[in-house]
Each structure stands twice: as structure tokens, then as C-alpha cells.
């Protein structure tokens, strides 16, 4: 039986594009997303199936929600 995901991949892609467009440095924002995903994966090691969303996608959603806070995008 196939699992149904509760997120829309098109929406995650749109949010990722918003993050990249809001950032002055594409490489830096990519590294920030990767670091946040790595941290989340370490912290949530016990709970592997949180909504069916992978750590990278969760990091993108979280960071795009925080776009109003420039310190997240800056350094």
C-alpha cells in the first residue's frame, strides 16, 4: 500500500525558489538549508516518519516561513 504525503511538492519547490530569490547568496542559503536539515535529522532520529516529509523539505518549509526575519537569510 502506498503512503499518502500531506504536503505538495510543487509548494515546497515554490518555497525553495522564494528562499533563493530572497537570499543575496545562493550557495549560503543552500548550505543553511542543508545544515538545518542535518540538525533536524539528528534531533528527530527516533521519529523517522514525521508526516512523511524529509528533513530537507521540512527545513525549506520552516525557513520560508521565517522569511520575514532577515537574520535567518543573512548570516
Curated annotation (Swiss-Prot):
Enzyme class name: transferase
Pfam families named among the record's database cross-references: RNA_pol_Rpb6
Catalysed transformations (reactions): RNA(n) + a ribonucleoside 5'-triphosphate = RNA(n+1) + diphosphate
Domain of life of the native organism: Bacteria
Example of a GO MF term: DNA-directed RNA polymerase activity
EC numbers, comma separated: 2.7.7.6
Family, as annotated: Belongs to the RNA polymerase subunit omega family.
Function: Promotes RNA polymerase assembly. Latches the N- and C-terminal regions of the beta' subunit thereby facilitating its interaction with the beta and alpha subunits.
Subunit field text: In cyanobacteria the RNAP catalytic core is composed of 2 alpha, 1 beta, 1 beta', 1 gamma and 1 omega subunit. When a sigma factor is associated with the core the holoenzyme is formed, which can initiate transcription.
Protein name listed in UniProt: DNA-directed RNA polymerase subunit omega
Organism taxonomic ancestry: Bacteria, Bacillati, Cyanobacteriota, Cyanophyceae, Gomontiellales
Gene: rpoZ
Amino acid at each position: 500500500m502506498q503512503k499518502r504525503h500531506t504536503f505538495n511538492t510543487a509548494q515546497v519547490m515554490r518555497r525553495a525558489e522564494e528562499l533563493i530569490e530572497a537570499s543575496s547568496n545562493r550557495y549560503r542559503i543552500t548550505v543553511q538549508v542543508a545544515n538545518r536539515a542535518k540538525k533536524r535529522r539528528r534531533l528527530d532520529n527516533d521519529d523517522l516518519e514525521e508526516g512523511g516529509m524529509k528533513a530537507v523539505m521540512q527545513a525549506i518549509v520552516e525557513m520560508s516561513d521565517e522569511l520575514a526575519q532577515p537574520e535567518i537569510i543573512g548570516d
